[in-house]
Amino acid sequence: MATVVGFDFGLKRFGAAVGQSVSMTASPLKEIPAQDGIPRWEAIEALLEEWKPALVIVGEPLNMDGSVSEMALRARKFARRLHGRYNLRVEMADERLTSSEAKSMVRERYGQRDFGRFAVDSIAAVFIVESWLEAHADNLDAFLHPPRKQGKSNDIID
């Protein structure tokens, strides 16, 4: 069993979720405040220390046509910083429509539009993690436990 942590990148806050490879499910975590896309690193560090993930997944907000958006570039920069600061394997995952899906779920389930009360960004992070786990179900073990090459890093940032 391996633990995976996922982030929904944002300018004001980051959604966070933790997933398990055995259950192929994820649960929302407390959102992390950010200022202009820069997270409170001490909150990120505490989360990573608590969950000790084998892999971190960062949502990549591509444009609807699949082209790279300015936000996607910023999310990639965040992923590189995660890798550099904590020496973790980081994967990017297409997050198109996850925030819309999370808001729809809150509206349907609770009849609410006060999305701040429901940690919508962390719900989006759940969708990011679960989608990634599902997409890699056939070779999950290889992603989560790659053989180490002597003297080389296998850490991946797409």
UniProtKB/Swiss-Prot annotation:
Single GO biological process annotation from the record: rRNA 5'-end processing
Any single Pfam family the record assigns to this protein: RuvX
GO cellular component labels: cytosol
EC primary class: hydrolase
CDD domains per record: YqgF
Localization per record: Cytoplasm
InterPro entries, alphabetized: RNaseH-like_sf, YqgF, YqgF/RNaseH-like_dom, YqgF/RNaseH-like_dom_sf
UniProt xrefs under SMART domains: YqgFc
An annotated Gene Ontology molecular function: nuclease activity
EC number(s) stated in the UniProt entry for this protein: 3.1.-.-
Top-level taxon of the source organism: Bacteria
Keyword field: Cytoplasm, Hydrolase, Nuclease, Ribosome biogenesis
HAMAP family on file: Nuclease_YqgF
Family: Belongs to the YqgF nuclease family.
Primary role: Could be a nuclease involved in processing of the 5'-end of pre-16S rRNA.
Protein name as catalogued: Putative pre-16S rRNA nuclease
